[in-house]
């Protein structure tokens, strides 16, 4: 049983494929066929899965795991999410303007005046470009485009995003920006 400290979702298993224990899976990697390149995949209940074979098929990959040898065993995995440890992702392969979704979650979104618009709670791609979900205390979640116009700077070390609230669609009128005041840190007693 493996407990992941910083899990990153890599794939979700769909239905069984054929009679030999293969499964269809939705891979969340840039190259779906590279799903097995990250080592063993893990479920949140502690099981570990070794990829033996993988092939791409339309919008999914077909995967054969060690120990999953028949259709019944494959069907039992339907809906299972598979993760790896964040440390297993290769940082050196990223370009300067590329980020892992997992690294963006938890960053605080602020404008150039220091006004906080919430924390990144999710990153989504519905087909028209990536979106960041921001959630602030007592506020409903909002989605903003993850684009150069909306997100001006990302500082992983400081845990912040510098955003343009007008380009992000958080305000409709530039005059509204002057009404916001920066969040003041609370004094320690």
Curated annotation (Swiss-Prot):
All copies of the PRC barrel domain together span: 96-169
User: Key word Cytoplasm present in the record?
Assistant: yes
Where does it reside?
Cytoplasm
Q: Name one GO molecular function term.
A: ribosome binding
Q: What biological-process GO terms show up in the record?
A: ribosomal small subunit biogenesis; rRNA processing
Any GO CC annotation of this UniProt entry: ribosome
From the record, give the cysteines joined by S-S bonds: none
The question of whether rRNA processing is a record keyword is answered with yes
Q: A single Pfam family, by name?
A: PRC
Q: Which UniProt keywords apply?
A: Chaperone, Cytoplasm, Ribosome biogenesis, rRNA processing
Q: Which InterPro entries match?
A: PRC-brl_dom, PRC_barrel-like_sf, RimM, RimM_N, RimM_N_sf, Transl_B-barrel_sf
Provide the domain comment.
The PRC barrel domain binds ribosomal protein uS19.
| Purpose | An accessory protein needed during the final step in the assembly of 30S ribosomal subunit, possibly for assembly of the head region. Essential for efficient processing of 16S rRNA. May be needed both before and after RbfA during the maturation of 16S rRNA. It has affinity for free ribosomal 30S subunits but not for 70S ribosomes.
How does the annotation summarize its subunit structure?
A: Binds ribosomal protein uS19.
Family, per entry: Belongs to the RimM family.
Q: What is this protein called?
A: Ribosome maturation factor RimM
Organism encoding this protein: Rhizobium johnstonii (strain DSM 114642 / LMG 32736 / 3841) (Rhizobium leguminosarum bv. viciae)
UniProt lists the gene as rimM
């Amino acid at each position: 049983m493996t407990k992941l400290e910083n899990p990153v979702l890599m794939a979700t298993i769909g239905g069984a494929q054929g009679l030999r224990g293969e499964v269809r899976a939705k891979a969340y990697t840039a190259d779906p066929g590279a799903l097995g390149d990250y080592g063993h995949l893990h479920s949140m209940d502690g099981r570990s899965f070794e990829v033996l074979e993988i092939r791409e098929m339309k919008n999914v990959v077909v995967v054969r795991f060690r120990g999953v040898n028949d259709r019944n065993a494959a069907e039992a995995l339907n809906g299972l999410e598979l993760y790896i440890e964040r440390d297993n992702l290769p940082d050196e392969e990223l370009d300067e303007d590329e980020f892992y979704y997992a690294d963006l979650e938890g960053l605080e979104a602020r404008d150039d005046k220091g006004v906080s618009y919430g924390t990144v709670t999710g990153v989504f791609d519905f087909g028209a470009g990536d979106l960041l979900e921001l959630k602030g205390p007592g506020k409903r979640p909002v989605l903003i485009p993850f684009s150069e116009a909306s997100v001006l700077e990302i500082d992983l070390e400081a845990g912040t995003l510098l955003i343009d609230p007008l380009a992000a669609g958080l305000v409709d009128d530039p005059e509204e920006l002057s009404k916001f005041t920066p969040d003041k840190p609370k004094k320690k007693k």
